[in-house]
Amino acid sequence: MEKKTLTYIQGIEIFRRKIELLPKNKNLLSRSRSLRKGYVLSEVVFWKQVRNKEFHQIDFDRQKIIGNYIVDFYIKSLGVVIEIDGSSHNDKEDYDNKRQLFLESLDLVVYRISDYRIKNDLIDVMKDLEDFIIEKFS
């Protein structure tokens, strides 16, 4: 199967991944929309970095429904879920593990970023995301 180029990061070719149609619980549509209007600071800060294909021409979805879950960000062309872990995630380790196993069962890759790092180290967060994408998809 021929690889298709998605973009270049640091001069390195990044290839698309073919992800099958994902399950979607339509009962979560209104919740997903309301979360997009929410103002979790770290999510807003990250979104400003990636919206409108501003991050290497890669298209990000925000508050994407996958199965019975709503993920923070999703890159369809790579099959990557990006989760921002803040204080609300500290007491939900079992839930997060179950959710991650489900996402990985769909052949998705989960990338986690701490809320604290986005607020305090954004440049390195974006550099680390570049490095992750290069490592996994070049």
Predicted regions and their residues:
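Solvent-exposed, charged helical/coil patches
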Residues: M1-Q57, K136-S138
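Basic, amphipathic alpha-helical patches used to engage nucleic acids or provide basic targeting signals
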Residues: L35, Y39, R62-E135
